Amino acid sequence: MMTHIKIILACLALTCSSLVRAQDGDNIRPQVVLHTTKGDVTVQLYNETPLHRDRFLALVKEGFYNGLLFHRIIYGFMIQTGDAATRDSLVETPSLDKSLLQKIPAEIHYPMFMHKRGALCAAREGDGANPQRMSSPTQFYIVYGKRFNDEMLDKQQLSINRSMGEQAITLTDEVRDIYKRIGGSPHLDGAYTVFGEVTEGIQVVRDIDWTPTDENDRPTEPVRIVSAEVISQ
C-alpha cells in the first residue's frame, strides 16, 4: 500500500513540476535585436500585449524592418521607424500578407507599462482620426526622454488632465519614482500601446536620439536598421 502511495505522490510531484515549467515558459519574453548603423539594440516583448508582440515578431521574421530609416527623431523624446517608404533602395522589399498591414487594436496597460526610458511603443494616428487608439501596422518608436523632478511631473499631470479629460491617467507614486530615476516621456502614458522595452543598447538609442535633424525631425544623416532578428521566443 505504501509503495502505491509513494508512486502516486511521485506522479503528482512530476505533474506539478511540469505545470510550473510550462507556466515559466509562458512568461518568457521574446527578444529581438535591431542591428542599426549606430549599433545593436535588443528589445524584449511583453506577453501581456500579444497582438503587438505577434505582429512585431512576424514583421521581423519577414525582414520588413531591414533597411528602414529612423525617419523621425526628436531630441530628448524618442526615435521612430517602420515606414516602408524609407527603405534603402539596395534592400529587397519583402512581400507581406495583407493581414500584417492592418491596424492593431490598442493594448494599453498603464501603469503596468509606461513610457519610461527604453520603452518600445506603437506609433499611431491622433485621436481625432483614430479615437480607438489603434496602432500603426508597422511603425514603432523607442522612448529616450528625460528625467523629471516633482515640479515637472506635477506640470505633466496637469497637461495630461487637460488633454485626456475624463480618460486622464494618474501618475502614481511608483510611476513618478521611475520617471525621476530613469526618465522617459510621461505625457504619452495611457494613450499609446507600450509593448516592450530595451534590455541592451540604450546608449545606442541615446546616440540615435542625439542625431542632428531638420525642421521636420528627419535626421540630416541617415540612421537605419540594417537588419532585425528574433534571438529568443
Which residue ranges define each predicted feature?
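Bacterial N-terminal signal peptides
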Residues: K6-S17
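N-terminal secretory signal peptides that target proteins for export/translocation
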Residues: M1-T3
